[in-house]
């Protein structure tokens, strides 16, 4: 007989997800600065998306493994917390080494070292992310699930705001240099990664210490599992062929809701990947009016010197991308506060689809905001001089933020109710395929589209992202949320 899972207080739910703030802090630093770092280390626009492929590939490999392993693990730290802590420690190592890639030039080319550290960071973030998702599903009862994932989304966006804006603050408030010659990384970016590593480790330790996972017998009672379906079942290790067969059987038999959400996820994450990779060159070209030739390493190498105005414009644009990313995270954090109530009132599908549509239209509107007029902007903590078009780009960040909040919460809230309790971890891991696969497709195609179709004019690839997200919005209406019978059949 299934026992009623106890309700959690607000602060208990907060503690379960608090580590997400630090993980997203690091993730935001990566999203806003990796293209900038790799460009400074010598990557061209076409190859940028290829370097970024390590992120979804790591997710594709790591999350299903970690999901399955955490379902079968129980030690003195619990089921999910050992993986969260280990991932955080590895991520900290990557965050310290990435901005120092030029130091290792005697052993590896800076771009190669940078790519390896991006791979380490992404693998580590994925080791943290998947168990955090499953931890919320484990600890938060169904009646509080919308609240649980909304708090998670709020914390993610708080971390993203601080992480995104940090290099800008270090430059314009503290006074660190934000420019770099080819083959170097700006000091403001280096120190931002050091601070991010510290925050990540601290918040994860808070969750590990302040959250007590249910004992196996309690978990089984709350999830309605029988002795034949233990949550911590430790079967003998099967041969590789058998494990692959079992994996593909799980994929084939995954709940219908999960398959339908995969379509929405494809078009959503295809768009997000483009934004993370190409916002920096798009803003630099479109708003700061830097010619696309200054993103060609061969041209730069052949030039007698890079004009100081180009170096300064690239640094300023890179910092402003952090402001834009922080802005959409602020709007996402605000929207996430109301997300659960809106979903309860209007339905998850309506809120999800509307949010994606706003995001898609916002991407497309990037074309409308070019204005080279230089103005002084008071940001309370400092005053900067930027093109008016840069300030106007804060408008579409509202829609991007709303879409981001929905993407972080809605599919998981819809999915959690469709998964059998004894397979939550592995299915959450498999669901990451719907995050990783579209990013891989985007990484393989976006660079070619940008160079072959748009002649390296990066603003148009942002429009492609908008069209993709609009298709995702339409796809939401074809998702059927799971019913009780389907869940029981999947649980076996």
Mark where each language-model region is:
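Cytoplasmic membrane-interface "Motif A"-like loop-to-helix N-cap segments
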Residues: 72-89, 345-356
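Helix-loop boundary and gating motifs at the non-cytosolic
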Residues: 2-58, 260-264, 268-296
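Loop-to-transmembrane helix entry/capping segments in MFS-fold secondary transporters
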Residues: 45-46, 142-151, 318, 419-431
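Intracellular juxtamembrane helix-capping segments at the cytosolic ends
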Residues: 127-140, 406-420
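Loop-to-transmembrane helix entry
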Residues: 44-54, 187, 289-329, 391-392, ...
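Helix-to-loop junctions at the C-terminal end of transmembrane segments
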Residues: 61-77, 334-348, 450
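Intracellular loop-helix junctions on the cytosolic face of multi-pass helical membrane proteins
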Residues: 1-10, 107-116, 127-128, 132-133, ...
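C-terminal ends and interior cores of transmembrane alpha-helices
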Residues: 85-108, 357-386
């Amino acid at each position: 007989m299934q026992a009623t899972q106890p309700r959690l207080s607000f602060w208990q739910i907060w503690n379960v997800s608090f580590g997400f703030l630090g993980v997203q802090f690091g993730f935001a630093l990566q999203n806003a600065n990796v293209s900038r770092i790799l460009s400074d280390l010598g990557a061209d626009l076409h190859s940028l998306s290829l370097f970024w492929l390590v992120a979804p590939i790591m997710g594709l490999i790591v999350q299903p493994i970690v999901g399955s392993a955490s379902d079968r693990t129980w030690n003195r730290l619990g089921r999910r917390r050992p993986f969260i802590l280990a991932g955080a420690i590895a991520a900290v190592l990557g965050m310290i080494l990435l901005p120092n890639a030029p130091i290792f030039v005697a052993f590896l080319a800076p771009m190669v070292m940078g790519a390896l550290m991006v791979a380490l960071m992404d693998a580590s973030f994925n080791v943290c992310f998947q168990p955090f998702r499953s931890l919320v599903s484990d600890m938060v009862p169904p009646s509080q699930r919308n609240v649980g994932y909304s708090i998670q989304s709020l914390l993610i966006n708080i971390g993203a705001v601080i992480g995104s804006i940090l290099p800008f603050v270090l430059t314009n408030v503290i006074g660190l240099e934000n420019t770099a010659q080819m083959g170097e990384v700006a000091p403001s970016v280096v120190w931002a990664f050091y601070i991010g590593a510290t925050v990540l480790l601290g918040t994860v330790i808070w969750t590990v210490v302040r959250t007590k996972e249910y004992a196996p017998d309690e978990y089984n009672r709350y999830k309605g599992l029988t002795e034949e379906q233990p949550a911590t079942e430790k079967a003998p290790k099967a041969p590789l062929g058998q494990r692959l067969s079992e994996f593909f059987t799980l994929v084939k038999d995954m709940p219908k809701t999960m398959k339908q959400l995969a379509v929405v996820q494809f078009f959503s994450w295809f768009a997000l990947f483009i934004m993370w990779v190409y916002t920096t060159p798009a803003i630099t070209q479109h708003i700061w009016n830097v010619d696309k030739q200054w993103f060609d390493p061969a041209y730069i190498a052949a030039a007698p010197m890079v004009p100081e105005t180009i170096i300064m414009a690239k640094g300023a644009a890179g910092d402003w991308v952090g402001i834009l990313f922080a802005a959409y995270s602020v709007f996402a954090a605000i929207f996430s506060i109301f997300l659960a109530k809106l979903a309860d009132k209007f339905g998850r599908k309506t809120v999800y689809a509307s949010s994606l549509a706003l995001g898609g239209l916002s991407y497309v509107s990037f074309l409308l905001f070019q204005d080279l007029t230089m103005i002084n902007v008071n940001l309370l903590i400092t005053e900067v001089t930027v093109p008016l078009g840069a300030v106007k780009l804060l408008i579409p960040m509202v829609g991007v933020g709303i879409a981001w909040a929905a993407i972080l919460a809605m599919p998981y809230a819809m999915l959690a109710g469709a998964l059998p309790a004894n397979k939550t971890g592995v299915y959450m891991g498999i669901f990451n395929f719907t995050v990783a696969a579209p990013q891989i497709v985007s990484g393989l195609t976006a660079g070619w589209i940008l160079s072959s179709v748009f002649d390296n004019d990066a603003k148009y690839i942002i429009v492609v992202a908008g069209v993709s997200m609009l298709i995702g919005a339409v796809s939401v209406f074809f998702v059927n949320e799971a019913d009780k019978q389907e869940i029981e059949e999947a649980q076996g």
